[in-house]
Amino acid sequence: MNEDRLSQTVEFCKLIDREKFVQRRTYLSDGERLENDAEHAWHMAVMALLLSEYANEKVDVLKVVSLLLVHDLVEIYAGDTFAYDEEGKKTQREREVAAAERLYSQLPEDLAGRMRSLWDEFEEWGSAESRFAHTLDNFQPLLLQHASGGRAWREGGRRLSEVLERNARSAEGSRTLWEFAREHFIQPEIDKGNLIDDID
């Protein structure tokens, strides 16, 4: 056994606990508090197990789960970029690449390569698995927006055009889930006045 390798990997396991401290802007289903990145990742991973039959293409579910669990770890260093923060989005890629290099350099080389490869695959949208993972990354907050009574949308004065722009590629991974979200999560919040319909 290579004890140095094990110790280095266990230290990384301790480090990624910090994902639990990265706060998102989506309320939990009860609307009482905001979720964190780790809760978001866990929720999507379980959703991947349950909803993979609705992917546009056949997917390797373990790969989808892996992509979902890894893709936001960089936010430990880069922080969460709010979906509607146009200024933050301008530097998001640069900050996240630097964070990925810093984060994964703390692993043994082969594991660092594996984790970085998963992150890159998610970012590039090039595989069926990454496209479906992106759909779930968008579907999950829409589900919580609706479950929490549209609280974050209402508080932020969000407009339908913003939500549609944010989800412009959601159907690439699952047309079925995107159509479901529009009908069951988005439209009800428009009807209740929590999301402003600014599209004629």
Regions found by a protein language model. Give the residues of each.
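Alpha-helical, largely C-terminal catalytic domains
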Residues: M1-D200
